[in-house]
A protein has these predicted regions:
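Histidine- and aromatic-rich segments of cupredoxin/plastocyanin-like copper-binding domains
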Residues: 121-143, 231, 235-389
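Short acidic/polar inter-strand loop motif in beta-rich domains
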Residues: 185-191, 350-357, 518-524
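N-terminal, post-signal-peptide metal-ligating segments of extracellular/periplasmic oxidoreductases
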Residues: 1-135, 148, 246-276, 310-313, ...
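Divalent metal-coordination and catalytic microenvironments
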Residues: 48, 94, 114, 181, ...
Length: 531
């Protein structure tokens, strides 16, 4: 595993981006970019290429094999996909080319629709599942096929129009995002083939510079000591070739856990603080991670962000992190506590019953060691990073009376006809199931029946606040890390989650869905429109 994440750097796009889709130059027929005059002309330019890469090695015991990845114009062959660094107040246009082979072998589909999870962007740049494209094919919500599509990421905080301050509400900042394919019915196989990468957003508080002289800056550990880690379980056939079950609608449990595309990798660190950004990349498994010594003694760390959003205060001396699919957790580990030569492991102790993707079963020690960490050197310079006592303040919640006056929408997640439904219906991309006024504040109730399944539910476009959790009508305490802003909410049996949602700054079509990727591909999704 590389000791430094590979970053995506800016480029010059030719032909230059335009407000309307440049179909004459080969762009897919998307709708016009919203707020183009405000953000388009000054946007920084980047490009990514979805392409097949030959010779990827998951582990030396496995044969080289083709995978699908997002690549920079000049590919870094040490990683599956580059990490994007971006900043609030600096809009960017990312041109995403589809260079996948049209006549590929194996699972997946060579069309793409790239979703930046959970960016606050116009719907035309959100990676709507029907916006998939290739040079010869267009999804139902596009007007023409194309070899590329421009995504305008305005990099404004939610509340831009409300506050009229030119940037939005800094308390609504996102931090750890990830981009992935979101093609209708093929999200799971395309992600399993490799179409996923990290996207990190910074601002004046979380500036990505531990030496930042700005007194407001948090000075958290920064690149190259800010390390994103994706965890995905995968199946391999007897010959060591990546395999995907294209039949089961329930979910998939892999026999190996891959970390940033590698099986049992080693991360070598210096004796100093690191920020580790953990992502459950799916498709179906839940994880509960512990940092342990070789004798399985648990080591403490500091929990600073949930679903990519900084908490208002760090949670000190934590011992584990539990993640459903698409959930993220940022933790800070101080490796200065350990002498050079120390070996540590990140272990998953959360089990599922064999071949049962319904829900996690139980926590069992010692668990599976999925990542080896070796403290192998002194830091080259003094560690100036810190974890301050206060991180990012949370926007205040409405009063009890204000909450009582808000509109409430109810969404039941259940199995139906061997598929997956929301309020008894399967996905229909042509018809919105909810029309939400732009600027609205609403309560969305997410719940399930007694069917034995957990559903990590993702709502596109804005973060939500978990107001309450009840099981069988009894209040359940909200964990400290879940009291911040979230975009994935795990529903279990007979449980009702009340989530406060806002819908600001952009209009258009978005989706809510179960992020168990198999459930998502088997119709557990609905379209909602901001109008």
């Amino acid at each position: 595993m590389p000791n430094e994440p590979a970053l995506l750097y800016g480029s010059t796009l030719n032909p230059p981006p335009t407000e309307l889709a440049n179909t004459a130059a080969g762009e897919a027929g998307r709708p016009a970019h919203q707020r183009w005059a405000e953000f388009g002309p000054q946007a920084e330019h980047y490009e990514l290429h979805a392409a097949q890469r030959e010779g990827w090695v998951f582990n030396p015991a496995y044969p080289p094999q083709p995978v699908w990845t997002f690549q920079a114009a000049v590919a870094d062959l040490s990683v599956l996909s580059p990490v994007v660094h971006s900043h609030y107040g600096h809009p960017m246009i990312c041109r995403i080319y589809n260079d996948l082979p049209a006549n590929h072998t194996g699972f997946g589909t060579p069309e793409i629709s790239t979703h930046l999870h959970n960016a606050h962007v116009g719907s035309e740049s959100d990676g709507f599942p029907g916006d998939y494209y290739s040079p010869t094919k267009a999804g139902p919500s596009l007007t023409a096929p194309g070899g590329f599509k421009d995504h305008l990421y305005s990099n404004i905080y939610a509340g831009y129009d409300e506050l009229q301050n030119g940037i939005g509400d800094y308390r609504e900042a996102l931090g750890t995002l990830f981009y992935h394919d979101h093609t209708l019915d093929f999200t799971a196989p395309n992600i399993v083939r490799g179409l996923m990468g990290f996207f990190l957003l910074f601002d004046h508080l979380d500036s990505g510079n531990e030496k930042d002289p700005n007194p407001a800056a948090l000075r958290l550990p920064s690149h190259p000591y800010d390390y994103p880690l994706s965890f995905c379980d995968r199946r391999f056939d007897p010959n060591g070739i990546l395999y995907y079950d294209q039949v089961s609608p329930e979910g998939i449990l892999g026999d190996k856990t891959i970390v940033n595309g590698k099986i049992q990798p080693v991360l070598r660190v210096a004796r100093r603080k690191y920020r580790l950004r953990l992502l459950n990349g799916g498709p179906s498994r839940f994880y509960q991670f512990y940092l342990v010594r070789p004798n399985n003694v648990i080591q403490p760390f500091t929990y600073i962000a949930n679903d990519g959003n900084l908490l208002d205060k760090p949670l000190l001396n934590q011992t584990n992190v539990r993640l459903g699919v698409a959930e993220r957790a940022d933790i800070v580990v101080d490796f200065s506590r350990y002498p050079v030569g120390t070996e540590l492991y990140l272990a998953n102790r959360l089990t599922h019953r064999p071949e049962d993707t319904r829900r996690p079963y139980q926590v069992v020690a010692p668990g599976e060691w999925v990542l080896k960490i070796v403290v192998d050197r002194e830091p080259p310079e003094q560690d100036l990073s810190q974890v301050p006592a206060n991180l990012r303040p949370l926007p205040p919640l409405p009063t009890t009376a204000q909450l009582a006056a808000l509109p409430v929408r109810k969404f039941l997640f259940e199995r139906r006809q061997n598929m997956w439904a929301i309020n008894g219906q399967f996905i229909n991309l042509n018809t919105p199931r909810a029309l939400v006024p732009m600027g609205a504040m609403e309560i969305w109730e997410l719940y399930s029946v007694d069917d034995g399944w957990d559903h990590p539910v993702h709502i596109h476009f804005e973060e939500g606040r978990l107001l309450s959790k009840t099981t069988d009508g009894r209040n359940v305490a909200i964990a400290a890390h879940e009291k911040g802003r979230k975009d994935v909410f795990n529903i279990t049996d007979r449980t009702v989650l009340r989530v406060l949602m806002r819908f600001r700054d952009y209009k258009g079509k978005y989706v809510m869905h179960c992020h168990n990727l198999i459930h998502e591909d088997h119709a557990m999704m609905l379209r909602f429109d901001i109008v």
